[in-house]
């Protein structure tokens, strides 16, 4: 009887192990998550392509910000390259504090994420968060944000709900990156007033004559007028399971000028995919990928740099 019971317990434990869907220790599978923003997509597609070229099996799941963090927390994805701080703190910090997600390395510094307006609106007097309510009628009591659940949207919603800067009567217009930019461009062309979520690096800074507002606070977009640092997040334990990929991620630092240039390439050539634009940039700027691949091997343990350079010749 006891022997049979032990066998049953062993079978249950074996079944539970077989149901686990995560990659095995030392697996070649690398699971990225991203959101549908130009810069994060470029970074993720580049990292995915490089890892695939050196023998890994990397993929990229496009999700919303809250779902990215839930997936990392549950161990369903491994890496996220788009942790914009401080604005994502409201979503990310509970997982970072819990320890299921690790803020692994800053992959970009000196970025910006805050409210912006067309330059003609700025020059007419709307220069600071404290000025927005004064021009409520011209703005139709609206602030344009991004997709549902976006961290910037949460900040705007909090500003409205708490009547910060006198914005209690405003509403947030939920859109997406391309829809928001299309609306801003159209309104700017017609001389209509609009306040919207802006960020850098991004091609919007080249195609829209725009200014960023001053006056954000620690409770909104940060005390330094929206200055942001973007971090690479990994699920707990990933760096121990995949030390070579973790080393690559430590090296994976993105200059702002690089993302601006690639973003502009995508804007001027609508047929170009994010990964293709990124590879074209690397082909012209080999010092970037050489730094990324320093000390990195292929999945089979060979030096990664010559393998990737052979792959890059196909672009």
Regions found by a protein language model. Give the residues of each.
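C-terminal functional modules
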Residues: 252-315
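Short, well-ordered beta-strand elements
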Residues: 27-39, 56-61, 140-144, 249
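Ligand-binding cleft/hinge of the Venus flytrap
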Residues: 47-54, 136-170, 283
């Amino acid at each position: 009887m006891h022997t049979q019971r032990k066998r049953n317990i062993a079978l249950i434990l074996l079944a539970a192990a077989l149901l686990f869907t995560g990659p095995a220790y030392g697996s070649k599978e690398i699971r990225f998550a991203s959101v549908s923003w130009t810069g994060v997509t470029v970074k993720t597609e580049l990292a995915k392509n490089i890892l695939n070229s050196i023998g890994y099996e990397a993929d990229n799941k496009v999700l919303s910000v809250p779902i990215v963090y839930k997936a990392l927390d549950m161990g369903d994805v491994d890496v996220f390259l788009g942790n914009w701080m401080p604005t994502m703190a409201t979503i990310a910090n509970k997982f970072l504090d819990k320890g299921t997600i690790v803020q692994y390395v800053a992959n970009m510094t000196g970025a910006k994420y805050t409210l912006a307006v067309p330059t003609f609106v700025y020059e007419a007097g709307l220069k600071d968060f404290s000025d927005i309510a004064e021009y409520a009628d011209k703005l139709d009591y609206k602030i344009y944000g991004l997709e549902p659940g976006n961290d910037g949207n949460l900040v705007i919603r909090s500003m409205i709900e708490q009547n910060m800067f006198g914005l209690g009567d405003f509403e947030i217009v939920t859109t997406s990156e391309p829809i928001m930019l299309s609306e801003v461009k159209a309104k700017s062309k017609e001389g209509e007033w609009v306040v919207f979520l802006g960020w850098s690096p991004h091609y919007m800074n080249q195609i829209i004559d725009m200014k960023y507002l001053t006056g954000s606070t620690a409770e909104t977009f940060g005390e330094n007028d929206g200055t942001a640092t973007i971090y690479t997040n990994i699920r707990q334990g990933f760096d121990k399971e995949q030390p070579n990929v973790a080393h690559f991620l430590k090296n994976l630092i993105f200059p702002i000028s690089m993302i601006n240039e690639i973003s502009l390439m995508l804007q001027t050539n609508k047929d170009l995919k994010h990964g293709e634009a990124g590879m074209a940039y690397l082909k012209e700027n080999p010092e970037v990928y050489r730094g990324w691949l320093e000390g990195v091997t292929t999945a089979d343990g060979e030096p990664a740099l010559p393998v990737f350079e052979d792959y890059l010749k196909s672009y």
